[in-house]
């Protein structure tokens, strides 16, 4: 009986998960690497009149590794039928380097506007990270 208690005790102690969640120094920095940045820190998107929408890729760096779910939104939306549509896809996932990408698209009605893009996520330690950037929609043609 004593031997059985020792074996059960060792089994329970040996199978206990004593790992602690490592709270890395996660960050969130979003950018628009394909766009020119103005002197006031805003990005400039030149609208292409040959397309229904003009697209660009936005980037997010978290330094938190793979599989962080990021949520995106903008302060402007576009009405399609009866649905309001954001100018950015609502979600993306980070890769092994902690980097995520998402598409941003503007319609012609946004020429002259400055759109604020928001991105956020909550890391494994429960810390919420939020960042934003501004994109000016211009038509220089």
List each language-model region with its residue ranges.
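Sec-dependent N-terminal signal peptides
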Residues: 4-13
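Bacterial Sec-dependent N-terminal signal peptides
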Residues: 12-41
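Solvent-exposed, low-complexity, repeat-rich "mucin-like" stalks and linkers
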Residues: 36-65
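Short, well-ordered beta-strand segments
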Residues: 60-82, 108, 132-134
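Glycine-centered loop-to-beta-strand initiation motif
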Residues: 94-100
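Short, hydrophobic beta-strand segments
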Residues: 100-109
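Short glycine/proline/serine/threonine-rich loop/turn segments at secondary-structure transition edges
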Residues: 108-116
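Coil residues (strongly favoring Ser/Thr
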Residues: 113-114, 124, 132
């Amino acid at each position: 009986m004593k031997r059985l208690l020792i074996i059960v005790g060792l089994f329970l102690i040996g199978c206990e998960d004593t790992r602690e969640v490592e709270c890395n120094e996660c960050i969130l920095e979003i950018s628009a690497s394909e766009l020119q940045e103005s002197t006031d820190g805003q990005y400039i998107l030149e609208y292409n009149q040959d397309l229904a929408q003009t697209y660009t890729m936005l980037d997010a760096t978290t330094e938190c590794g793979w599989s962080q779910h990021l949520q995106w939104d903008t302060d402007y939306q576009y009405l399609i039928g009866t649905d309001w549509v954001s100018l950015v896809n609502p979600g993306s996932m980070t890769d092994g380097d902690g980097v995520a990408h998402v598409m941003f698209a503007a319609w012609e009605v946004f020429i002259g506007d400055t759109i604020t893009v928001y991105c956020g996520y909550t890391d494994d330690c429960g810390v919420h990270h939020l960042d934003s950037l501004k994109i000016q929609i211009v038509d220089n043609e």
